[in-house]
């Protein structure tokens, strides 16, 4: 098949089409701190919920990922992982959210939620965009069969735990409102690294989804976020916090000890600069009118 419609490329082009208006008068040194689910973070910049880093990079990469988050006070999101790996990451010291796959064996979902509760994770999430393979049939991941989540199942998942439940893979007002009505307390706008071609860029979907919700809940964004300017664009358009994924993998590969922490701190500096230059001096003052779409 011809490689067309790559959603990562489309998302990158969309990000680059968003321009930033400066507003210097009455601005001040910005405060980018964030309170999320009762915890305070130095920045709304988070890690993405990556999986199988030891397989994709080198043995110990997942530990380096968790350590990089802990050393910078960054909220750590983790994707598919065994309980021991999750515990090892949590022991590094970062606040942590685990994203759980839509296992056809639903008991496994509940088991993972109970484990997350037992080790003190900040929240748990469900990957709703991972049930199907390339032929539209059930996806198979590491020997596990996946299946689509129903709204009734999502209600049961939300009611079974005291942890906030987040849904990852939302790109429509339909999924957003269905999830919120089921009791979800956070949404991740993401096309999951080109799960489907020609997907709407998350920042294109963000304003409409935010406007459609009657309840104010955290909205997270991932996909092609690379710089503090990218982060700012997402925040200005209504995101609560923003995840970075593949650039952190590259940073770890280049420098396993300090690459990730250095990258995160540099992106924070870029975000502070952009907030100062636009008069958005804290996260509550983010203003979508400073973003202009270059046609």
What are these regions (language model features)?
Residues 36-81:
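Active-site cofactor/substrate anionic-group-binding motifs, chiefly glycine-
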Residues 52-53, 79-85, 129-130, 173:
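Short glycine-enriched loops at secondary-structure junctions
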Residues 27-38, 77-89, 112:
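Short, charged beta->alpha transition segments
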Residues 1-41, 285-286, 292:
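An N-cap/entry alpha-helix motif that binds or orients negatively charged groups
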Residues 66-67, 71, 91-92, 104-221, ...:
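Alpha/beta enzyme core
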Residues 69-106:
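A gly/proline- and charged-residue-enriched helix-loop-helix capping module
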Residues 269-295:
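Charged C-terminal helix
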Residues 8, 140, 199-212, 250-275:
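C-terminal helical cap(s) of enzyme catalytic domains, especially alpha/beta-barrels
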